[in-house]
Amino acid sequence: MKPSIVAKLEALQERHEEVLAHLGDADVIADQERFRALSREYAQLTDVTNCFKAWSAVQDDLKAAEIMLDDPEMREMAQEEIRDAKVRNEELEQQLQLLLLPKDPDDERNCFLEVRAGTGGDEAAIFAGDLFRMYSRYAESRRWKVEVISANDGEHGGYKEIIAKVSGEQVYGHLKFESGGHRVQRVPETESQGRIHTSACTVAVLPEIPDAELPEISPSDLRIDTFRSSGAGGQHVNTTDSAIRITHIPTGIVVECQDERSQHKNKAKAMSVLAARIRAAEVRKRQEAEASERRNLLGSGDRSDRNRTYNFPQGRVTDHRINLTLYRLDEVIEGKLDMLVQPIVNEYQADLLSALSEQD
């Protein structure tokens, strides 16, 4: 392992011990906010510290075994210990490299999931409904909560657009690579000739922004319109102007929310989505400015990217970003997404590891 990486690990181990000492300090214990922050840092450092201690112990074992090689009676046992230690050393180095990868602070957060019908008319809207159902099933399997913020129903089923908040553990970290273009190839129910049609949807996944990190939005930059809700809602539908449309004038970003009967609640939800979109636009702009020649798997989250093709006649789903094809579309569309999500995460980590290995 490179000396620079060892030095970095030694510094993290020292910090781990330092944080532990702080956690036993009476002043820190009395300051609950600082205590919680240090507790989180301690938890984050524990895995890498324990792994580094195990790696250091293996180095000691290797040195001891190499000394034993000089003793003819111990040589055979020493050679066996060296073989075992080298295998263990390689395993621990791989673990340490993964633990050293830069963490995306947004990975722990809830997210807003947006699915929009693209080209393909009614069939695209139906596919948008299928995608949202797929993500909802996936969320259910992970015990996440899905809360619809806004939905614009398609004329023959599905959605022209649907926005939902997904809450739970590591939500954004699992869903962020879903941002982009999704294409479906299948025979529509209304197709009498049996011809395969191609339709498309776009998916955007935005991390929820904590109140403390909300971008400053001047009221003068907003245009707020109210209108009457449409869709399900019983006797209260169309009786009050409870739906909200907020336009952020500088960026042209528009958010609607009509899910709640309370105008105040709709406005609060719409502002949360607006803040997430503004921040995402800022991040995208910064990523584009800092873009290097190195391939970036996630890209900027550009919705024109073609992520996947779902081919129903062949039961095939293809992720074009990593050239992965699975003939398990029936399982994927029912929400078993880990078989697609994990390979992308692995590829992304491999890119980061490659960059880490190029550092001094």
Curated annotation (Swiss-Prot):
Give the family, as the similarity comment puts it. Belongs to the prokaryotic/mitochondrial release factor family.
Q: Which GO terms describe its molecular function?
A: translation release factor activity, codon specific
Which Gene3D superfamilies does the UniProt record give?
Answer: 3.30.160.20, 3.30.70.1660, 6.10.140.1950
Pfam families xref list: PCRF, RF-1
Localization in the cell: Cytoplasm
Q: InterPro entries this protein is in?
A: PCRF, Pep_chain_release_fac_I, Pep_chain_release_fac_I_sf, Prokaryotic/Mito_RF, RF-1
Keywords in UniProt for this one?
Cytoplasm, Methylation, Protein biosynthesis
Among PROSITE patterns, the record links this protein to: RF_PROK_I
Predominant localisation class:
cytoplasm
Q: Which residues carry this modification: N5-methylglutamine?
A: Q235
SUPFAM superfamilies the record matches: Release factor (SSF75620)
Keyword Protein biosynthesis in the entry? The reply is: yes
- Tell me the domain of life: Bacteria
List the coiled-coil residues: none
List the GO cellular component terms.
Answer: cytoplasm
Where is the stretch described as Disordered?
285-313
- The name on file for this protein is Peptide chain release factor 1
Q: Could you confirm whether the keyword Mitochondrion appears in this record?
A: no
**Role according to the record:** Peptide chain release factor 1 directs the termination of translation in response to the peptide chain termination codons UAG and UAA.
> Which gene is annotated as encoding this protein in its UniProt record?
prfA
- PTM annotation: Methylated by PrmC. Methylation increases the termination efficiency of RF1.
Q: Where is the composition biased (Basic and acidic residues)?
A: 285-308
